[in-house]
Design a protein with these regions (language model features):
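Short beta-strand segments enriched for Tyr within beta-sheet-rich domains
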Residues: 2, 32, 105-107
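Acidic helix/loop microenvironments that form the catalytic cleft of cell-wall polysaccharide enzymes
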Residues: 10-12, 90-91
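Alpha-helical transmission elements in cytosolic ATPase-linked domains
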Residues: 7, 19-22, 101, 185
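Glycine/threonine-rich flexible loop motifs
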Residues: 13-19, 44
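Amphipathic coiled-coil/heptad-repeat helices and related helical stalk/stem segments
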Residues: 5, 20, 152-155
Length: 223
């Protein structure tokens, strides 16, 4: 029953292989377990694993992550009062969808530059990256089935009047992949709807992009 941070991504066929990072030492030194969920949408188990977590199969990504969290709790690695979810960008979409579905499963969520207004972005073909996302998420503007499916899980559209865990959301003013208005809108709507007294924090980096600050000094400052 240790404190545990469960990282997840699950999109674009990107595999989250186990690796060492010195940025996690502060967690390890405080006896916090770092776990990485190999969920569908990634390609840890081949092309089929990716295809089963994209387009009209996207919800498999969210259910896999929830299953990983429940497994870690059932096996006594951690508990509901000690597990925190973490994901960034498309992993932030994952966190947003999961926290709307299972808010009582986590002590908290960390959502970095999260893709949380995914339906609005998908509908706006003038944005530079939208059309390139069709193969991953679908085309909601021209396909009714895609529209209804994305709407059914898009984090912004599925915020409810209920208790949420502690949530930290980060965004960057110069992010050209997930525009800063997405996390801001999500935070504002969440603040208006949540019925708990848990923390809801938004941090905006004024001189950073999608990957955070640039240069050695900027990276160290963020850490």
């Amino acid at each position: 029953n240790s404190n545990l941070l469960l990282y997840g991504y699950g999109s674009y066929g990107n595999s989250m292989w186990p690796s060492f990072s010195s940025t996690r030492l502060s967690l390890i030194n405080r006896d916090i377990i770092w776990a990485t969920a190999h969920i569908r949408g990634g390609m840890e188990r081949g092309m089929k694993w990716w295809k089963e977590g994209k387009l009209l199969n996207k919800k498999n990504t969210f259910q896999d992550y929830i299953s990983c969290a429940k497994f870690l709790i059932d096996k006594k690695y951690t508990s509901k009062k000690k597990i925190i979810g973490m994901g960034g960008s498309a992993g932030g979409l994952l966190m947003g969808a999961v926290v709307n579905e299972k808010p009582d499963l986590f002590l908290g969520m960390i959502m970095a530059v999260p893709f949380v207004d995914s339906l609005t972005t998908n509908l706006d073909h003038s944005l530079p990256l939208t059309i390139g996302e069709f193969d991953e998420f679908g085309n909601a503007k021209e396909n009714k089935e895609h529209f209804e499916y994305i709407y059914s899980y898009a984090p912004y559209n599925n915020i409810k009047k209920m208790d949420y865990p502690n949530i930290l959301i980060t965004t960057s003013l110069s992010d050209n992949r997930v525009l800063f208005d997405e996390p801001l809108k999500f935070t504002a709507k969440l603040r208006d709807n949540k019925t708990d007294n848990n923390l809801l924090l938004l941090k905006t980096e004024m001189n950073a992009g999608h990957g955070g600050k640039s240069g050695r000094d900027g990276i160290i400052e963020e850490i």
